[in-house]
Amino acid sequence: FIRLTPLVTYLIGASPSVCKCFMTGREHQLLPLIKGTLYLPYATALRMGRFGYQNSAQKQLGIHYNNLKDYVADLQKAVYTPYPPFSRLGLDDANGEPIQINDHVLQIENEYYSLVRPKQIPEAGETPSQALANRGIAYVELRAVDVNPYSDIGINEDTAAFLEVIALYCLLKNSSDLPESEQDLIDQNQAEVVNRGRAPNAKILEPNAEYLLEDWLNIHITAMLPLADLLNQTYATDIYSN
């Protein structure tokens, strides 16, 4: 899913503009749209870029998804690793009121921002990582999905069906371990699609390959069609392929 996140960002992204207040005191290249609103002409989901769903401290963690054991170990390490900027803040303000739980990169495990998270329902006294280590993955959170502003509940049936197809595609598709060098390419791809995914010359980078975004999307959507057809047959519908 991490490799395919640009596909989700492009098709479901719904935040090409942001409130001007979010940019106060920050360097940016966003353009004025209307009063109080900034945007980029070819943006898809600025929420998923460096001005939104990001945490610079957490990017240094290098939490890996290649296997569950390493993921759990990396997550637990982050909860006990001090982060100097947080340490400088201290735990209490001048009046003795608490301002943070601790000075660690993650104050609690649920603070970890990521595009996808494996989850297990914790039992009494368990942390999320302990639940994963003890009983494995029960479900997966897909967190790269913008709220649909045209839906009363933030998502429509078509989008839910598409996410079901891509989740099944990711489950069945062979996926090699993700090295740091490729993670850098994935970060570049995500930035490209977030900021200029609707540009005609938007590109996707892979190890030893480069694609126009449109061509890359078509490759994967075409590969998903048999799964969509199978789901259509199973549930007597056509929503998965439409």
Map each language-model feature to its residues.
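Loop-rich catalytic cores of soluble enzymes, especially ATP-dependent carboxylate-amine ligases
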Residues: 1-131, 179-184, 202-209
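Short, hydrophobic/amphipathic alpha-helical patches that form generic packing surfaces
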Residues: 3-6, 164-172, 222-226
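Flexible helix-coil linker/hinge segments at domain or subdomain boundaries
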Residues: 7-10, 167-196
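Cationic, histidine-enriched alpha-helical/coil surfaces that engage anionic ligands
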Residues: 91, 188-242
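Structured core elements
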Residues: 112, 139-143
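Core structural elements
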Residues: 134-138
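Glycine- and acidic
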Residues: 143-155, 202-210
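C-terminal, active-site-flanking charged/polar segments
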Residues: 144-150, 157-177
